[in-house]
A protein has these predicted regions:
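Conserved glycine-rich Rossmann-like NAD(P)H-binding loop of the short-chain dehydrogenase/reductase
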Residues: 25-40
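The beta1-alpha1 cofactor-binding region of Rossmann-like NAD(H)/NADP(H)-dependent oxidoreductases
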Residues: 37, 58-70, 101
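Substrate-binding pocket helix/loop in short-chain dehydrogenase/reductase
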Residues: 95-96, 103-108
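A short, exposed helix-loop element centered on a Lys and neighboring polar residues
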Residues: 119-120
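Catalytic loop of short-chain dehydrogenase/reductase
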Residues: 135-144
Length: 144
């Protein structure tokens, strides 16, 4: 039986690299993007060329309803997940006293609330199976 990993923000960058590596290790991949489904589909194509199953899901991880819908779809398509890689994130390059309120809210929504939303949904499934792995990726920019 194959194992499945959901990698948020996996249409490009570090998330895509993680998704490709997990595919090389034998995982089927749920590719998540916030907006660019075309780019996510390119990641899916690369993963399937490695012989693994992959499906793209467009969902804003900061929106709990979109996250719940994504997890329901993943359950239908893959039968659940074994690994969650919380990678989706944004960086608004500004110092503490210069950051705009909108940028701060966007960063908190995606970088914290989004991770929590996905981890909570994954945990509900993983607890039932009594197994699972959650990996949270951050960066040096998380330091104010």
């Amino acid at each position: 039986m194959s194992k499945t990993a959901l990698v948020t923000g996996s249409s490009r960058g570090i998330g895509k690299a993680c998704a490709l590596k997990l595919a090389e290790l034998g995982y089927d991949i749920a590719v998540n993007c916030n907006s660019n489904l075309e780019m996510a589909q390119k990641a899916v194509d690369e993963i399937t060329s490695l012989g693994r199953k992959a499906v793209a899901y467009k969902a804003n991880t900061a929106d709990i309803d979109e996250v719940k819908d994504m997890f329901r779809s993943i359950q239908q398509d893959f039968g659940g997940i074994d690994v969650l890689v919380n990678n989706a994130g944004v960086v608004d390059d500004a110092y503490l006293l210069m950051i705009k309120d909108e940028s701060l809210e966007r960063s908190l929504d995606i970088n914290i609330k989004g991770y929590f939303n996905c981890a909570r949904q994954a945990s509900l499934k993983m607890l039932r199976k009594k197994s699972g792995i959650i990996i949270n990726i951050s960066s040096v920019r998380s330091v104010l």
